[in-house]
């Protein structure tokens, strides 16, 4: 019968049992009575080092003698109220009515300028001509035609009796004198620009382009000629370029580290089917190269790889594309070698970075051909004619063609050739009958009876006309009696038909 294991009581219940006279467990008693090793060390070093009210001990944390206080609280007192912000008082100066200045009728009509004049106190007196605070001359101009009449400026009234005619001397009112400021340093420069191309009346402006004449500049050259420099602006090659301060985030960029072996690959199977570089297998047309490949490798067995660079490879990642500094496209794969194997079956090995740079696509070069010689052709461009080509009449007069230049020479050569006559025979096959050339002279070889050798008799190619040759034997007809066929269909035997009568 198996005994059931009972769970131990809590430390609080065990300590209460100890106080009531029960069994006292040493670790529980020392914890509640603060007699552990940590408490003894605090009591010994407490006289030498003061830790404050930190409450360090084996008991529960109480937060010191004053307990914990929430963060951000201002204490148990009354929170301070915000002081009111008062706007400073602005001294208001009262403005009363201005005093009325009486005008004497006998005073001068020229009113001196007191208010409204320009303030030139801030300008230095030695600032230069036209800029400093020099004395400005003041001139007063009066119109002599209107400067007549009384002092008061009103009309003169004459009183008469009722029977007499009233004569009123109407005088024009006095005008205010004009005051002008005159500055001797003020100069006005009028610039007039004449541009003949802005005239709307000129509608047929012809421009003649001739590379044999150089341009002329009218007036002073106000432009400064400086050597130009190439600014070498760099434009992004991608639609979303990566910032210079951005870290390495792509797997292809993280593969360039000192803890990873770099291995360039030139085999074309690295792009189509990289598994053929690790193990011997047949070519699979349905293989997807954009996947990760896992290989079953036994560390204890020795297996050769088709490519020595992929020996002991247990894992190949999917391809990653990146750009090199030369502007080429680089295909990268991360491989893991199976070197060590633990007891649990975990395979450990270094990582290798395999990469292959794709060649750049060169631009197509198209060979251009010259259609005509334009050495003596001039071009005139104007508003009405787009392009007009004119030839020099003097050059045309010097060109003379003879009749021999106009003949088209035949490049065919019929030397050592003969005529062939073709025909079709009874069976429908084509038969070619060559006709020998008459100009070819025949050579006859006669065997020498003597023992001195073989002599050839060369006939003369020149034919000498001779007289009529009379044969010594009379001609007689020749009948062919040995022919084995007859051309007349009558002589062909007929085949008899056999009729069966039922």
Curated annotation (Swiss-Prot):
The entry describes its oligomerization and partners as: Interacts with major capsid protein L1. Interacts with E2; this interaction inhibits E2 transcriptional activity but not the DNA replication function E2. Interacts with host GADD45GIP1. Interacts with host HSPA8; this interaction is required for L2 nuclear translocation. Interacts with host importins KPNB2 and KPNB3. Forms a complex with importin alpha2-beta1 heterodimers via interaction with the importin alpha2 adapter. Interacts with host DYNLT1; this interaction is essential for virus intracellular transport during entry.
Classification lineage: Viruses, Monodnaviria, Shotokuvirae, Cossaviricota, Papovaviricetes
Entry function:
Minor protein of the capsid that localizes along the inner surface of the virion, within the central cavities beneath the L1 pentamers. Plays a role in capsid stabilization through interaction with the major capsid protein L1. Once the virion enters the host cell, L2 escorts the genomic DNA into the nucleus by promoting escape from the endosomal compartments and traffic through the host Golgi network.
What does the PTM comment of the record read? Highly phosphorylated.
- What this protein is called in its record is Minor capsid protein L2
GO terms (molecular function) for this protein are: DNA binding; structural molecule activity
Where is this chain primarily localised?
virion
Q: Which domain of life is it from?
A: Viruses
Instruction: Show the GO cellular component annotation of the record.
Output: host cell; host cell endosome; host cell Golgi apparatus; host cell nucleus; viral capsid
Q: Which keywords belong to this entry?
A: Capsid protein, Cytoplasmic inwards viral transport, Disulfide bond, DNA-binding, Host endosome, Host Golgi apparatus, Host nucleus, Host-virus interaction, Late protein, Microtubular inwards viral transport, Phosphoprotein, Viral penetration into host nucleus, Virion, Virus entry into host cell
User: Cellular location of this protein?
Assistant: Virion; Host nucleus; Host early endosome; Host Golgi apparatus
UniProt record, GO biological process: microtubule-dependent intracellular transport of viral material towards nucleus; symbiont entry into host cell; viral penetration into host nucleus
- The chain's disulfide connectivity reads 18-24
- Protein's gene: L2
Please give one Pfam family short name. Late_protein_L2
Similarity-based family? Belongs to the papillomaviridae L2 protein family.
- Please indicate the residue ranges that the annotation assigns to the motif Nuclear localization signal: 1-9, 493-501
């Amino acid at each position: 019968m198996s005994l059931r294991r009972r769970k131990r009581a809590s430390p609080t219940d065990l300590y209460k049992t100890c106080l009531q006279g029960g069994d006292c467990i040493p670790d529980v008693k020392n914890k509640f009575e603060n007699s552990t090793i940590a408490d003894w060390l605090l009591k010994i070093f407490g006289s030498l080092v003061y830790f404050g009210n930190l409450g360090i001990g084996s008991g529960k944390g109480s937060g010191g003698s004053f307990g914990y206080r929430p963060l951000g609280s201002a204490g148990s007192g009354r929170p301070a109220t915000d002081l009111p912000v008062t706007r400073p008082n602005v001294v208001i100066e009262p403005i009363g009515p201005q005093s009325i200045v009486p005008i004497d009728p006998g005073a001068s009509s020229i009113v001196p300028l007191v208010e409204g004049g320009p303030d030139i106190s801030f300008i230095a007196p030695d600032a230069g001509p036209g800029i400093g605070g020099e004395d400005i001359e003041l001139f007063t101009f009066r119109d002599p035609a209107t400067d007549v009449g009384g002092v008061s400026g009103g009309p003169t009234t004459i009183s008469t009796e009722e029977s007499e005619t009233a004569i009123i001397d109407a005088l024009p009112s006095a005008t205010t004198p004009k005051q002008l400021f005159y500055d001797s340093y003020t100069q006005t420069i009028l610039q007039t620009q004449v541009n003949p191309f802005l005239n709307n009346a000129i509608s047929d402006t012809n421009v003649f382009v001739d590379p044999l004449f150089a341009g002329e500049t009218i007036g002073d050259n106000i432009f400064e000629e400086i050597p130009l420099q190439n600014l070498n602006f760099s434009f992004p090659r991608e639609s979303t370029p990566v910032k210079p301060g951005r870290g390495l985030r792509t797997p292809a960029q993280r593969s360039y580290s000192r803890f990873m072996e770099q291995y360039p690959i030139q085999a074309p199977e690295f792009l189509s089917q990289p598994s053929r570089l690790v193990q011997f297998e047949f070519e699979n047309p349905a293989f997807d190269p954009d996947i990760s490949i896992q290989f079953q490798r036994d560390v204890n067995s020795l297996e050769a790889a088709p490519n020595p660079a992929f020996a002991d490879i247990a894992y190949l990642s999917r391809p990653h594309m990146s750009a090199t500094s030369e502007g080429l496209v680089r295909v990268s794969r991360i491989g893991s070698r199976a070197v060590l194997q633990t007891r649990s079956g975990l395979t450990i090995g270094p990582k290798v970075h395999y990469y292959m740079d794709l060649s750049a696509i060169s631009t197509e070069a198209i060979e251009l051909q010259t259609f005509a010689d334009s050495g003596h052709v001039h071009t005139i461009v104007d508003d009405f004619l787009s392009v007009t080509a004119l030839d020099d009449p003097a050059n045309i007069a010097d060109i003379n063609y003879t009749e021999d230049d106009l003949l088209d020479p035949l490049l065919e050569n019929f030397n050592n050739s003969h005529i062939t006559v073709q025909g079709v025979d009874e069976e429908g096959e084509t038969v070619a009958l060559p006709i020998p050339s008459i100009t070819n002279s025949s050579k006859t070889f006669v065997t020498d009876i003597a023992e001195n050798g073989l002599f050839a008799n060369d006939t003369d190619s020149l034919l000498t006309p001779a007289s009529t040759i009379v044969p010594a034997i009379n001609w007689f007809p020749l009948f062919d009696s040995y022919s084995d066929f007859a051309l007349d269909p009558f002589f062909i035997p007929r085949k008899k038909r056999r009729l069966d009568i039922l």
